Amino acid sequence: MTKRITKVCIPTAGSGKRLKYLTKEINKSLIDINYKPAISYIIEKFPSNSEFIIPLGHKGEIVKNFLKIAYPKKKFIFVKVKNFDGIGSGLGLSLLKAKKFLKTPFIFVSCDTLFEGSIPNLKKNWVGYSSTKNNGQYRGIEFNNRNEIIKFHKKSFKSSKFKKTYI
């Protein structure tokens, strides 16, 4: 029997430049949405036995302190990402820094992704995505005509009928 995936990676290292003044003093994962930080909506979607890998960068100590205080019974592994802005920074670097904790199947969720419904009982590779007309500000997925993923795109990719925005 295949075990359910319980490891969750939520990178929070980025500086959130597109949010401008909102992220000057706080990490984008902690921006309040209806009186609750965005990252809380994500963490609360997962079962109590989940292990969270959190790459930290911009205002990382604030994120770390918040999570330890708000969720004292949750298991967190914090990974420091020093180069979180500028040349060589980005999501790929955050995942590389967390690599030693991600040697088993895991669920990746961007720190500012909000979604309805529950997390499926995942036992194998899976990607959640959404269609959007204004997809230039998001990363994207390109599918072939058999609905198989053939490429992940950086932000500002050109849209086509086989491309979707992933979460």
Regions found by a protein language model. Give the residues of each.
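Short beta-strand-to-loop acidic/aromatic patch adjacent to the donor-nucleotide binding site
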Residues: 104-114
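N-terminal beta1-alpha1 ligand-phosphate binding loop
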Residues: 12-17, 25
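Glycine-rich phosphate-binding "P-loop"
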Residues: 21-24, 28-31
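Short glycine-/acidic-enriched loop or helix-start segments at secondary-structure transitions
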Residues: 20-21, 63-66, 117-120, 138
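Short, polar loop motifs at secondary-structure junctions
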Residues: 58-60, 112-115
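Short beta-strand/turn micro-motifs composed of small residues
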Residues: 12, 56, 110, 130
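Conserved N-terminal catalytic core of the sugar/cofactor nucleotidyltransferase
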Residues: 2-10, 18, 32, 36-106
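Conserved core of the sugar-phosphate nucleotidyltransferase
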Residues: 114-167
